Each structure stands twice: as C-alpha cells, then as structure tokens.
Amino acid sequence: MLPHPGACHCSNTINEMKALEKEHVMSVVNTIFKQLVSTTSADVIGSWGVSSIVTTQIVQNINGDNYAMAALVLTVDGLQFSGDAYVAYDEGNDYYRIYAVKSDGKLQEYRKDVAFDEIGSVLDQMIEKGSMTQQEYEEKISALYNLKVITL
C-alpha cells in the first residue's frame, strides 16, 4: 500500500535507507510532468478531473530491498478511477511505475516498466477509458453529459 500524499513519506521511517535529496526529487518529478504534458493532449489530461498535483517520494520493496522513488501524484476523478495516481520513476531500470490508489489507501491498479511516451496512455486507460474502445468511450461521454462528441 502506498502512503497518501499528505502522509509522511520520509524514508527515516525505514531503517538503513536514506531519503532522496529534495532537489533530486523535484528534478525527477519536473521531468515526469514535462514528459506527460508533451506526450499527452490537454483534453485527455483534462478528462481526468485532476484536482491536485503533488511531488513526493515513495518507498517500494523490490526483491526484499527498499528503494525510494521520486513520484508525481495526481489526485483524479475519472470515469474508471477516483483517487491518487502515482507516477514513480524507477531509476534502476529507467522506466516508470504507475499506481492507482483509492482514497481509502487501497491499491486498485499497478503497472511497471512504463516508458516515458506511454505514461499518458497508461494513465488514461486507468483513470478514464478502462477497456472501452474510442467509440464506446465517446458514446458513454455523450450519454453521461448529453453531448455530441465529434472526433476530428
């Protein structure tokens, strides 16, 4: 289970592990954010109902060892998921891990080995579209909001 963004994420709660430097975390999360907005259209990000964006670090046990990872946390309210979406950079393998954590702290979905240019599509699938096709999604949006969706 991942901690809520407001909770203490300091690794001093875990013996034998050093927290990442604040500047490093900020730099990594800034890169995550830039990669997300440069590879994902604004209307897609807007559909997630983002209400807050937080910089943090999370601790993940991988093969018995604890690792701190810088993470971008988006609080979202989409069709498929509402809660916190963590995009954490796994420096050991140069890929991202994405976690969807409900407001009760329970992990709903997890993806690993996500490339930078896949972050937006993975988040969109988790938060908004699920397994719907584009046509099914447009029909659901049309019915839900009484709108006609036009794909250009």
Annotate each language-model stretch with its function.
Residues C8-C10, I14, K18-M26, G105-L152:
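Mixed-charge, Lys/Arg-enriched low-complexity segments
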Residues M1-A7:
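Positively charged N-terminal leader segments that act as targeting/secretion signals
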Residues G92-G105:
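Short, surface-exposed beta-strand/strand-loop-strand elements in extracellular ectodomains
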Residues L72-L74, Y86-Y89, Y95:
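Eukaryotic intrinsically disordered, low-complexity regulatory linkers and tails enriched in Ser/Thr/Pro
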Residues I14, K18-L79:
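Negatively charged, low-complexity tracts enriched in Asp/Glu with abundant Ser/Thr
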Residues Q80-A85:
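Short, surface-exposed coil-to-beta transition loops
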